Amino acid sequence: MKFVAAYLLAVLAGNASPSADDLTAILESVGCEVDNEKMELLLSQLSGKDITELIAAGREKFASVPCGGGGVAVAAAAPAAGGAAPAAEAKKEEKVEEKEESDDDMGFSLFD
């Protein structure tokens, strides 16, 4: 991931085709170790490709992946219709619990 980040930083800085030396300089400037084998693999896979096209293709792939976020939105929308009643019930339950806790010590401490 750090190699991808360094590659993107170099592209954003205006270098359309960063070399291994460019990525090494970026990574060493922040104290990262450089694995030349992984870096060369990334550069070989990205050589001759436009980074904006790769990002667009990646977005399309992520858009087709189910993420399960729909269940959360439905659950969050359901209490909105009757939101006042559950909130009032929760406050009543909290008050009941506080009374029970205060009665447990019977007005004195065992360690006095």
From Swiss-Prot:
GO molecular function per UniProt: protein-containing complex binding; structural constituent of ribosome
GO cellular component term, pick one: cytosolic large ribosomal subunit
Record CDD domains: Ribosomal_P2
Disordered: annotated segments: 83-112
BP GO annotations: cytoplasmic translational elongation
A Pfam family of this chain: Ribosomal_60s
Entry similarity comment: Belongs to the eukaryotic ribosomal protein P1/P2 family.
Protein name (record): Large ribosomal subunit protein P2A
Gene (name only): RPP2A
